């Protein structure tokens, strides 16, 4: 995805998906392709938040005002100029028996999302631009900036519609306040809408829902033998002025 970092521009909306297709063709077969954008949203400009909330003594990043989930139909084999663009609060239309690729992108400033679809299984096939061996999972945990592609097989019996879930991890924030943590949309099997399938509510916050260390690249690339070792200790915390910073070996950036 593309985004601007100057004064937190991407948190204010300067961000968009950017899909690069393999010249030799996709690593897996599927029938259709959607991009799913997950994000948090602040009503104040990010520059104001940095100055008045984060970069002050004992400051912290405030709780978002809302979460966002929206879709783009990035249809397999078509150029970008033919794409219809993003659609917020849309439904995701499936046809029975087809296999769909969903490209999940977390464009948040601070929020981790837990994504699943009731009544459907998923297989991770790509992580951060790297094709991986099929990894079955019922939930995809997407950190800030991460990208995953999953294959979802449509049901053979189109008798019900199903709920799409994107839970915002509450451990990211302090006081949640009025923030709605569970975003939902609708996976449909018909133009007129149908009875909803059973909704599966999950308590996901603070839990490890998938083991990304088990993802295996589909095309392995060997590592060179190192001749020098560099140790970096990465942490976040308060500097000497009690301002929040991330640091390498206790040097803040």
Per-range role (PLM):
Residues 26-28, 121-131:
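Short aromatic-acidic-glycine turn motif
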Residues 32-99, 105-108, 228, 235-237, ...:
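Acidic-aromatic/histidine active-site loop/patch
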Residues 85-87, 133-136:
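Short alpha-helix capping/helix-loop boundary micro-motifs
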Residues 106-123:
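Short acidic, flexible loop segments centered on an aromatic residue
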């Amino acid at each position: 995805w593309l985004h601007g970092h100057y004064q937190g521009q991407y948190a204010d909306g300067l961000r968009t998906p950017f899909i690069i297709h393999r010249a030799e063709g996709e690593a897996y077969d599927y029938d259709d392709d959607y991009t799913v954008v997950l994000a948090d949203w602040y009503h104040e400009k990010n520059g104001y938040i940095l100055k008045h909330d984060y970069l002050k003594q004992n400051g912290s990043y405030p709780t978002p005002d809302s979460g966002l989930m929206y879709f783009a139909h990035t249809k397999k084999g078509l150029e970008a100029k033919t794409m219809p663009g993003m659609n917020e609060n849309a439904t995701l239309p499936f046809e029975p028996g087809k296999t769909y690729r969903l490209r999940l992108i977390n464009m948040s400033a601070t929020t981790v999302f837990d994504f699943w679809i009731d009544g459907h299984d998923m297989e991770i096939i790509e992580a951060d631009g790297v094709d991986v061996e099929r990894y079955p999972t019922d939930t995809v945990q997407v950190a800030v900036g991460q990208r995953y592609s999953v294959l979802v097989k449509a049901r053979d019996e189109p008798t019900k519609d199903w709920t799409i879930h994107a839970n915002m991890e509450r451990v990211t924030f302090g006081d949640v306040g009025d923030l709605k943590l569970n975003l939902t949309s609708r996976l449909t099997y018909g133009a007129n809408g149908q009875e909803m399938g059973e909704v599966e509510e999950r308590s996901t916050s603070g839990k490890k829902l998938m083991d990304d260390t088990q993802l295996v690249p589909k095309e392995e690339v060997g590592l060179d033998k190192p001749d020098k070792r560099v140790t970096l200790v990465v942490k976040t915390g308060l500097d000497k002025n009690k301002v929040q910073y991330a640091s390498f070996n206790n040097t803040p950036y």
